[in-house]
Curated annotation (Swiss-Prot):
Keywords: Ribonucleoprotein, Ribosomal protein, RNA-binding, rRNA-binding. The lineage of its organism: Bacteria, Pseudomonadati, Pseudomonadota, Alphaproteobacteria, Rickettsiales. It comes from the Bacteria. The gene is rplD. Part of the 50S ribosomal subunit. InterPro entries: Ribosomal_uL4, Ribosomal_uL4-like, Ribosomal_uL4_dom_sf. Signal peptide: none annotated. This is Large ribosomal subunit protein uL4.
Length: 204
C-alpha cells in the first residue's frame, strides 16, 4: 500500500509504504467499544466514598429500651434510617481497572488505524523537524489540512510541543503512547515515517 508523503506545510515530498496488516484490518467495531471502555475505566480515579454506619460520628448507645415504648426497636442512632446516619451500600474507594487481552488491544489499534485510513483521515509526514515556535505559526501549518482536529504522532521537540499546546484541536503524542481512544477522538491522524516503523515492530 502506497500513499503520499507530505510535510507540515502539506507539500508532497515523496511516497510512503503502508503495511496492509496494519492499515487494512477487518473492521470489528465491538472490539473498539471494548477497548475504549477499558481505557476509560483505567483513567477513573476511584476516589468516591460515602460514610457507612461505622464511619459517621455519633453515640454507640442504644437510644431507648427494647420494650415498653411502643416504638420500633432501634439499636443505634447511626443507622441509615436516622438523620445523620450512615449510608448503606454506598461507593467506596476502589480501582475500576480490569484486564484486557494484549492480542485484543493490538487488534483494536489495527482496526482504529484501518478505519481512519479507509476514511482518508491518515496523513503520513516525513518528519516533525520544522522551525515552529509560536502558536500562530502552528495554526498556519495546520490550516493547510482540511480537518477539524489532529492527532500528531512522532518524536517531536519542545518547541513544537509549546507551539501546539494552546490549540485545543491539536494533540501531540509519542509513538509509544498511540492508543485507540485518542485515534477515534480526533478526525485526522498524522504519523511520521519513524512512527510507521515503530508500529510494525509493536503490532506485527
Amino acid at each position: 500500500m502506497e500513499c503520499n508523503l507530505v510535510n507540515l506545510s502539506n507539500d508532497n515530498v515523496g511516497a510512503a509504504q503502508l503495511n496492509p496488516l496494519i492499515f487494512s484490518a477487518k473492521q470489528k467495531l465491538s472490539i473498539l467499544h471494548d477497548i475504549v471502555r477499558w481505557q476509560l475505566a483505567k483513567r477513573r480515579a476511584g476516589t468516591h466514598k460515602t460514610k457507612g454506619i461505622s464511619d459517621v460520628s455519633g453515640t454507640t448507645a442504644k437510644p431507648y429500651g427494647q420494650k415498653r415504648t411502643g416504638r420500633a426497636r432501634q439499636g443505634s442512632l447511626r443507622s441509615p434510617q436516622f438523620r445523620g446516619g450512615g449510608i448503606i451500600f454506598g461507593p467506596v474507594v476502589r480501582s475500576h481497572t480490569y484486564s484486557l487481552n494484549k492480542k485484543v488491544r493490538k487488534f483494536g489499534l489495527k482496526i482504529a488505524l484501518s478505519l481512519k485510513y479507509l476514511n482518508n483521515q491518515v496523513i503520513i509526514l516525513d518528519n516533525l523537524n520544522i522551525d515552529v515556535k509560536k502558536t500562530s505559526e502552528m495554526c498556519k501549518c495546520i490550516k493547510n489540512f482540511k480537518f477539524s482536529s489532529f492527532l500528531i504522532v512522532g518524536d517531536y521537540g519542545d518547541d513544537l510541543l509549546r507551539a501546539a499546546k494552546n490549540l485545543h484541536y491539536v494533540d501531540l503524542i509519542k509513538p509509544i503512547g498511540l492508543n485507540v481512544f485518542d485515534i477515534l477522538n480526533h478526525e485526522c491522524v498524522m504519523l511520521t515515517k519513524d512512527t510507521l516503523k515503530h508500529l510494525e515492530g509493536r503490532l506485527l
